[in-house]
């Protein structure tokens, strides 16, 4: 099968790796130097119609769209208009991620558990409401912000500052919601709009510094599987995944692709923190190396509305991801730092997230630069292998968290 992967980050490198392991011919646009070792890179303008034309011209059997911005731009719709199966939600269905105010209203309409909230389209109304709240206050930019549009404000003044920043943008909306307590977990469902298969639960570590301190990032590391009881998993399936898929069908915008539910396991049960419309990043770098079955075939089947969940199989054991971020990230990441990356092993691999080539050298080009994945029979083994490989990488000033897995007693700190 010929597979076209769209994107250039660590998530897309993990998608390419999964498809290549299954023996497929893999193309990628725009890609990165790490992806180039496993796929043929295609230079192309990145607008939706041109990408769909590229898929036709290259004879792609299926297109897998990585980043959310491409989904919001309608790449899947354009591919389908040309008769090319594409794995991902339509532009309309991707609103589940792209418009947090709409997404919250959708959850209310369909009885999907989430935090109490209010949405605002003017700064004055948002400020008035924030002044009545007791910290911590959760403030969200309603638009796409690459996982960095959330502020957990520990004072009303901090919430007001976050709101003022959001409303510097034309047409902005903000969501203010109650702060939830509990363990956070990522649940990803591969779905054809009705049938679905869950990946192993995983847990991201979203702040830049250890102990869940510092500014929010796109994610600094993952432990997988994260321990979720069978009773809670059944509630997640019934009250969140199945209600969401049924609700999208009922509203005439069936959701195909990867439904990512970011959840809080609260004392009152699992609740949705947010939905994403694609593989998480860095969750993809954790769950896809555990996939034993054929991702490209699952993507094609889902795009055709014919997914067989029983065919989606993951290996036993565990994975761990450690992100190496540039100095200055997330505010002002330094770019152009020379990288020296050792060879992968069967149980540890480096996925390129923000790299490029300059004057014959591999250098950093983004905030999150590398994702190092370790595999093992246990979470401890996986973490040990991820850190061992990360410590062999030459990357001056790299930021990484040494406490991945600490919430479940791993990573050198108690939960």
Curated annotation (Swiss-Prot):
Its cofactor is Mg(2+); Mn(2+). Residues 104-304 form the ATP-grasp domain. InterPro entries: ATP-grasp, ATP_grasp_subdomain_1, PreATP-grasp_dom_sf, PRibGlycinamid_synth_ATP-grasp, PRibGlycinamide_synth, PRibGlycinamide_synth_C-dom, PRibGlycinamide_synth_C_sf, PRibGlycinamide_synth_CS. It comes from Deinococcus radiodurans (strain ATCC 13939 / DSM 20539 / JCM 16871 / CCUG 27074 / LMG 4051 / NBRC 15346 / NCIMB 9279 / VKM B-1422 / R1). The gene is purD. The lineage of its organism: Bacteria, Thermotogati, Deinococcota, Deinococci, Deinococcales. It catalyses: 5-phospho-beta-D-ribosylamine + glycine + ATP = N(1)-(5-phospho-beta-D-ribosyl)glycinamide + ADP + phosphate + H(+). Belongs to the GARS family. One of its GO terms (molecular function) is ATP binding. ATP binds at residues 130-186. This is Phosphoribosylamine--glycine ligase. Binds 1 Mg(2+) or Mn(2+) ion per subunit. Pfam families: GARS_A, GARS_C, GARS_N. HAMAP family: GARS. It is an enzyme of class 6 (ligase). One of its GO terms (biological process) is 'de novo' IMP biosynthetic process. Its EC number is 6.3.4.13. Pathway: Purine metabolism; IMP biosynthesis via de novo pathway; N(1)-(5-phospho-D-ribosyl)glycinamide from 5-phospho-alpha-D-ribose 1-diphosphate: step 2/2. Mg(2+) binds at residues 274, 276. Keywords: ATP-binding, Ligase, Magnesium, Manganese, Metal-binding, Nucleotide-binding, Purine biosynthesis.
């Amino acid at each position: 099968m010929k597979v076209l992967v769209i994107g250039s980050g660590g998530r897309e490198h993990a998608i390419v790796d999964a498809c290549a392991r299954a023996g497929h011919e893999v193309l990628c646009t725009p890609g990165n130097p790490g992806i180039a070792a496993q796929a043929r890179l295609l230079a192309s303008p990145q607008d939706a119609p041109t990408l769909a034309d590229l898929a036709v011209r290259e004879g792609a059997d299926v297109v897998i769209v990585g980043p959310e911005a491409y989904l919001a731009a309608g790449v899947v719709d354009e591919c389908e208009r040309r008769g090319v199966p594409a794995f991902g939600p339509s532009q309309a269905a991707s609103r589940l991620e792209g418009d947090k105010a709409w997404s919250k209203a959708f959850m209310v309409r369909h009885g999907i558990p989430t935090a109490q909230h209010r949405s605002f389209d003017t700064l004055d109304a948002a400020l008035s409401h924030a002044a009545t709240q007791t910290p911590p206050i959760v403030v969200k930019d309603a638009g796409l912000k690459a996982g960095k549009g959330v502020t957990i404000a520990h004072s009303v003044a901090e919430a007001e500052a976050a709101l003022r920043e959001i409303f510097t943008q034309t047409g902005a909306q903000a969501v203010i919601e109650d702060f939830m307590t509990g363990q956070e977990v990522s649940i990803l469902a591969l779905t054809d709009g009705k049938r679905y298969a869950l990946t192993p639960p995983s847990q991201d570590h979203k702040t830049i510094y250890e102990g869940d301190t510092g500014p929010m990032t796109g994610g600094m590391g993952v432990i997988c599987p994260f321990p979720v009881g069978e009773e809670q998993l059944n509630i997640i399936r019934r009250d969140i995944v199945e209600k969401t898929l049924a609700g999208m069908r009922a509203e005439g915008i069936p959701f195909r692709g990867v439904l990512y539910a970011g959840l809080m396991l609260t004392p009152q049960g699992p609740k949705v923190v947010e939905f994403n419309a694609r593989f998480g990043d860095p969750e993809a770098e954790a769950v896809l190396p555990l996939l034993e079955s054929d991702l490209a075939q699952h993507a094609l089947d889902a795009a055709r509305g014919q997914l067989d969940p029983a065919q989606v199989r993951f290996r036993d054991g565990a994975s761990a991801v450690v992100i190496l971020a540039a100095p200055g990230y997330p505010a002002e990441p330094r770019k152009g730092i020379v990288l020296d990356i050792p060879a992968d092993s069967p149980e540890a691999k480096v996925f390129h997230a923000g790299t490029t080539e300059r004057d014959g050298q591999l250098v950093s080009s983004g905030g999150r630069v590398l994702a190092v994945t370790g595999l093992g029979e246990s979470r401890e083994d996986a973490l040990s292998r991820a850190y061992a490989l990360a410590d062999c990488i030459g990357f001056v000033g790299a930021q990484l968290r040494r406490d991945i897995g600490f919430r479940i007693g791993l990573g050198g700190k108690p939960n």
